[in-house]
Amino acid sequence: MLCLIFLLFSVSFSVQAEIYQWSDTKGNKHFSDRPYQDAQTLHISPGYTYHYVKKVYDGDTILLANGKKVRLLGINTPEVEGRNKTAQAGGEQAKRWLQKKLQNKKVRLLKDVEKNDKYGRLLAHVFTEDKQHINLELVEKGLASVNIHPPNLKYTDQLLKAELLAEQQRLGIWNYKEYQPKQANQIKQARFQGWQRVIGQIINIRHSRKYSYLNFSDTFGLKIERRSSDLFPELESYVGKKLEARGWINKHKNRYSMFIRHPSQLKVINSR
């Protein structure tokens, strides 16, 4: 038994471990991480490491007691006021909810393909000790929108189902005028900050070496990396259709664009 305990503590807690058990001719049980003849496989679930949350920066970023920042995967919450940042509608509500839920509490992190973002923050789905999925709860309550960054695709289906329900019930951000859909031809008339929803008809598609552009007009296009095109339906199938695009509006010279990383950012609007 002591050998089994030693083996369990020797195995990384983040990896599913296989331990083998067999009996010798005297009936004594033995355990190893290597398979022996006639050995039985024991499937040992990994243990979990929990971290204390020291600070909540906003609705989707926290600081652990070990000094590491964590950006919650698969979601986006509105900004709160800070250095070089203007407060956005719903940002403080998301932050307060997360503070109440997590500050000075213990959490478990579940990572995806990419471990860190370009700012050095850990990327993770965050779970409480009683197994509540915080990323998902933020979406369920309308405090966050879904924001998928391939190749990090864990829980995509669950997040999108929760978002659809929150939108249908007009919870949180889905009831703010700031996040109601704007017509594509209105974009040049005003400056819209933060995450937005834009509606328009795709008139054509243009390809460059690195990107494809689904164009609402000569001055506004949806920008998709060509290397990510296998995640989408045939891009040509969008031409002529009315879409709602979700993301951040960028301006370069006299042209506007929205970077589309995942097909969940595009909603086909059925014409009746």
Residues of each region from the PLM?
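N-terminal signal peptide c-region/cleavage motif recognized by signal peptidases
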Residues: 10-14
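Small beta-barrel nucleic-acid-binding modules, primarily SNase/OB-fold domains
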Residues: 15-272
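Cleavable N-terminal signal peptides
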Residues: 3-5, 15
